[in-house]
Amino acid sequence: MMGDNEGRRTPLLNLGVQVSMRVLTIGAAMASMWVMITNREVASVYGIAFEAKYSYSSAFRYLVYAQIAVCAATLFTLVWACLAVRRRGLVFALFFFDLLTTLTAISAFSAAFAEGYVGKYGNKQAGWLPICGYVHGYCSRVTISLAMSFASFILLFILTVLTASAARHY
């Protein structure tokens, strides 16, 4: 009798964890995207004004577009996870979508992080100077966006592991 109860509670508990983590992932990805999109600062260097915007960097644009894709895919898999509780055959497809979404999230984070690193520390060999001393607020908001992006990746990674574990049992 106890085994029957556990069998019924596990999918529901797993569904609760899945839904909670997917909602948190969507929130983190949307926050990352919003902070990056609204990030803009104008600075003056030696009397010359220049503007720092996310759209001037292909890596930051990629991060924004990837976060949009992460939100859409996670919303899709949120519905899919609810269906997978009733139809066990859908679990592998859920794992596959989670894996693709996780890979998208980490690739976008990595590209944007590399760009942010160069912006903060420069690259002496290439002759690129750090710019964060001039646009400190811009760099701080990029850091916040990257932290939220990394949080969405971690949540997706955990979801992928949980889904892979569930797929193994079915």
From Swiss-Prot:
Membrane topology listed for this record: Multi-pass membrane protein
Stretches assigned to the Cytoplasmic side: 1-16, 84-88, 163-170
Locations listed in the record: Cell membrane
One Pfam family hit: CASP_dom
Coiled coil: none
Bilayer-crossing regions: 17-37, 63-83, 89-109, 142-162
Keyword terms of this UniProt record: Cell membrane, Membrane, Transmembrane, Transmembrane helix
UniProt entry tagged with the keyword Lipid metabolism: no
Record topology, Extracellular segments: 38-62, 110-141
Similarity remark: Belongs to the Casparian strip membrane proteins (CASP) family.
NCBIfam families with a match to the protein in the record: A_tha_TIGR01569
Record note on quaternary structure: Homodimer and heterodimers.
Protein name, per record: CASP-like protein 1F1
Lineage: Eukaryota, Viridiplantae, Streptophyta, Embryophyta, Tracheophyta
